[in-house]
């Protein structure tokens, strides 16, 4: 999975950056928001909790997904500006990220114990 930033602009009135991106996924279906959020946060060098993926759209037959994300200066700004349902969706994505990281840590510790 490869993420490319197409356009990025500052929106100082709303304390955020707005990013248009494309995800190329040759070997699999449409990626989950949690995977894309992790990649975007790494590319933009920001904390995962301030990256809100507004939308992701795939076209039939193409192996790419176009999306739009908002990167806030803080979680407080995100919660103040975004509608409540978007904040709830964002929190669910963050929970998915946490559970994925916990599962990968557990599997790594089990593998290291087996090697010993």
From Swiss-Prot:
Keywords (A to Z) from UniProt: Ribonucleoprotein, Ribosomal protein
InterPro entries xrefs: eRP_eS24_sf, Ribosomal_eS24, Ribosomal_eS24_CS, Ribosomal_uL23/eL15/eS24_sf
Region (Disordered), start-end ranges: 81-116
Gene Ontology MF terms: structural constituent of ribosome
UniProt-listed Gene3D superfamilies: 3.30.70.3370
GO BP: translation
PROSITE patterns per UniProt: RIBOSOMAL_S24E
Comp. bias regions, Acidic residues: 96-116
Superkingdom of the organism of origin: Archaea
GO terms for cellular component: ribonucleoprotein complex; ribosome
Family, per entry: Belongs to the eukaryotic ribosomal protein eS24 family.
Record-linked HAMAP family: Ribosomal_eS24 (MF_00545)
UniProt protein name: Small ribosomal subunit protein eS24
Lineage, opening ranks: Archaea, Methanobacteriati, Methanobacteriota, Methanomada group, Methanopyri
